[in-house]
Amino acid sequence: METQSTGTEDGFTPVTHRGGRRAKKRQAEQSSAAGQDGEAGRMDTEEARPAKRPVFPPLSGDQLLTGKEETRKIPVPGNRYTPLKENWMKIFTPIVEHLGLQIRFNLKSRNVEIRTCKDTKDVSALTKAADFVKAFVLGFQVEDALALIRLDDLFLESFEITDVKPLKGDHLSRAIGRIAGKGGKTKFTIENVTRTRIVLADVHVHILGSFQNIKMARTAICNLILGNPPSKVYGNIRAVASRSADRF
């Protein structure tokens, strides 16, 4: 085995193996290669990262609506044909004049069809008009349903009495009677206290109002379905309504 010797003061001769030199050389090459790779990766990262976040200006309604026309179809049940015909101008006027949409009633498919056109300025106009017509079809008055176009924080919620409690026969009829009350007194009281509008159509209950008010009205109606006396329900919703008024 070859060695390299150098003299020292103590007389000892240090021995260096050739294999050791090769190992050191290999380690130096690996460390230099790793350093180059790290620099290259860092450079790639720096190049990939943009210098500034891109800023896109907001699009106007005209730019968003350019392209294919959008359409909404609202089916009309048979029992709402006559009210729709009688109140057609009240429905037609705000949708066409204020929202800039096109509307028609398709006699063949029995749907109210609403679509956008070049006069449509607001992106959300089609959704507002569809909610307005849907509310009228469900049984709300035109004046009440019109609030869906004027205000942004109003919603529709529908559920069935049997979703709350599986009732049948006379038990179901009594539950409907508890919700309506004598001459509609209970329903009107819930509407006035919670500032909502309620439509009771057989086993279907439709509520129109803001999110918090719908929650209060729904809780009161569910308590009536479950059998709570109306006087207790009145007290509960009045207490909740007064707390909400104090909070805001």
From Swiss-Prot:
GO CC terms of this entry: nucleolus; nucleoplasm; small-subunit processome
Location relative to the cell: Nucleus, Nucleolus
Keyword Secreted: no
Protein's name according to its UniProt entry: RNA-binding protein PNO1
Pfam family, one: KH_PNO1_2nd
Subunit structure of this chain's protein: Part of the small subunit (SSU) processome, composed of more than 70 proteins and the RNA chaperone small nucleolar RNA (snoRNA) U3.
Compositional bias (Basic and acidic residues): 39-50
Gene name as annotated: Pno1
Region (Disordered): 1-63
Biological function: Part of the small subunit (SSU) processome, first precursor of the small eukaryotic ribosomal subunit. During the assembly of the SSU processome in the nucleolus, many ribosome biogenesis factors, an RNA chaperone and ribosomal proteins associate with the nascent pre-rRNA and work in concert to generate RNA folding, modifications, rearrangements and cleavage as well as targeted degradation of pre-ribosomal RNA by the RNA exosome. Positively regulates dimethylation of two adjacent adenosines in the loop of a conserved hairpin near the 3'-end of 18S rRNA.
Chief site of localization: nucleus
GO-annotated biological processes: ribosomal small subunit biogenesis
Family: Belongs to the PNO1 family.
Native species: Mus musculus (Mouse)
Gene3D superfamilies reported in the protein's UniProt record: K Homology domain, type 1
Domain KH: 169-221
